[in-house]
């Protein structure tokens, strides 16, 4: 049986080794490297599906944990699945719920069967297992589902992480057995291992034997220094299949998107562009702009003079500052629209640079303009 999702390799950048490819799914194809906006509760905050199409978002994320708790996977199944429910006709990836459960560290208990935990709002007792995660994701009907994994904290003791990745492998096998719709939903495995290179290798090799149609690197971008993350990605990549999509979870800052594309990753997601937009922080071609700052009060220029998105074509920095200061929802819509447009355009530029075998040159140009070449660059 042909997997529901396949990877087509187009070319490798001669200068950097980055990959240009196409991921084919039941709801359409997208070129990689690609950034995926996060729609936690079946909506990318403040953005309509039409606006997502306008900015060239090809695939979006849904969050299994949140959708299970509200409105419930049974309702979404009755609605015809997540695509119908939220009126999105492109590909959707759902996470397994694992990351959310593991972030409730003081409210949870990990066992071999799964994780017992308390609802983050009302305190009710809940249980999530590989089988339950598959049932929920099968009901949601996403194109790409993620295996239920344990996401160990970083740093963590070696023995703890080793036990954790071995449990993640056993859970991955249970996910494959429980997955009811492999013909129209692809299940990806998640490589863990914290900051231990031998454990990253062990996790990758064990999961590759299970022959998932795609693989993710999890447990990074959780607060470790970026050089550590880049080192782990570079090390882990060599144990990942060349003929399947590679997804780096939780990465969305411009520098990391470029650096990890260079290191052979294809897919990225992060709440960063939408989360910082709600505080009025914007990514621009000249670096970070905190639009609430007083210096923009009388600035009638566009947010980013080098951007041709709807926000930058139509509204001034002064107007955006006014809206954010006044806590007007429209301001958040405009900053969110711009940030997502900016990152999706960055990915387009990365793909073009790979086509032209000049991604390292592009990195230098971008870092210089964005202000990332200084000793302590501003981060988000």
UniProtKB/Swiss-Prot annotation:
Catalytic activity field: 7-aminomethyl-7-carbaguanine + guanosine(34) in tRNA = 7-aminomethyl-7-carbaguanosine(34) in tRNA + guanine
Signal peptide residue numbers: none
The protein's annotated pathway: tRNA modification; tRNA-queuosine biosynthesis
Keywords, comma-separated and alphabetical: Glycosyltransferase, Metal-binding, Queuosine biosynthesis, Transferase, tRNA processing, Zinc
Binding site for Zn(2+): 307, 309, 312, 338
Catalytic residues identified in the record: 95 (proton acceptor), 269 (nucleophile)
Enzyme Commission code(s) on record: 2.4.2.29
A Gene Ontology molecular function term of the record: metal ion binding
Annotated GO CC locations: cytosol
Protein's job: Catalyzes the base-exchange of a guanine (G) residue with the queuine precursor 7-aminomethyl-7-deazaguanine (PreQ1) at position 34 (anticodon wobble position) in tRNAs with GU(N) anticodons (tRNA-Asp, -Asn, -His and -Tyr). Catalysis occurs through a double-displacement mechanism. The nucleophile active site attacks the C1' of nucleotide 34 to detach the guanine base from the RNA, forming a covalent enzyme-RNA intermediate. The proton acceptor active site deprotonates the incoming PreQ1, allowing a nucleophilic attack on the C1' of the ribose to form the product.
Protein name from the UniProt record: Queuine tRNA-ribosyltransferase
Species whose genome carries this gene: Staphylococcus carnosus (strain TM300)
Gene assigned in the entry: tgt
